[in-house]
Design a protein with these regions (language model features):
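Membrane-interfacial loop-to-transmembrane alpha-helix junctions, especially the N-terminal start
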Residues: 4-12, 65-79, 124-134
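Membrane-helix interface and helix-disruption motif detector
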Residues: 33-42, 91-106, 144-154
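Aromatic-anchored segments of alpha-helical transmembrane domains
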Residues: 16-22, 79-88, 136-146
Length: 169
């Protein structure tokens, strides 16, 4: 029963996170401006695509993504909540309170995400190469955009990668 729930979560979370990126204008949420740039959108899509292909590969090869322990599920859900808080809190220089909240959630999500990448890299040798590729894509993304201003957008991309790669039995 729990495997089925985790399979569904592993499939739905990335899709639910991808929907706002497609259908809503970033201007409505008052983004920092990174994702409003057309080149950044194309680069973001390039970074998201390998994660989506990896998800498709796992499901077609009947190797579903599932979470081994309840702690891992809680950890991922906590990271998801932090990322969503970053995603939906506006960053506006004229409103320092909301800007600080946005940066607070963004920085916490960033450090938790890095710890999760490290944990998966050392604990799961099966996904080690995939982690390296996704980290490289994230590095290319942030260095090409030459800015950490769009931290929430960057976390949005990396959280999709993280939610696709979980521990296996």
């Amino acid at each position: 029963m729990s495997k089925k729930i985790n399979q569904v979560l592993g499939f739905l979370i990335p899709i639910l996170l991808f929907i706002p990126y497609i259908f809503f204008s970033p201007i409505k949420f008052n983004y920092t401006g990174l994702i409003n740039d057309t080149d950044a959108k194309l680069l973001s899509s390039f970074c998201i695509l390998p994660s989506m292909l990896f998800l498709t590969y796992l499901f077609y090869n009947k190797k579903p993504v599932y979470i081994k322990q309840k702690k891992w599920l809680i950890y991922n859900l906590f990271l998801l909540v932090l990322m969503l808080m970053t995603f939906f809190t506006p960053y506006n220089k004229s409103e320092p309170v909301t800007s600080n909240i946005h940066l607070f959630f963004g920085v916490i999500s960033f450090y938790i995400m890095i710890l999760e990448y490290i944990a998966i890299f050392y604990l799961d040798s099966h996904n080690r190469n995939i982690i390296c590729i996704l980290c490289l894509l994230d590095f290319i993304y942030i260095t090409t955009c030459m800015s950490v201003n769009g931290l929430s957008e960057w976390i949005f991309i990396t959280i999709i990668s993280i939610s696709l790669i979980t521990k296996k039995n």
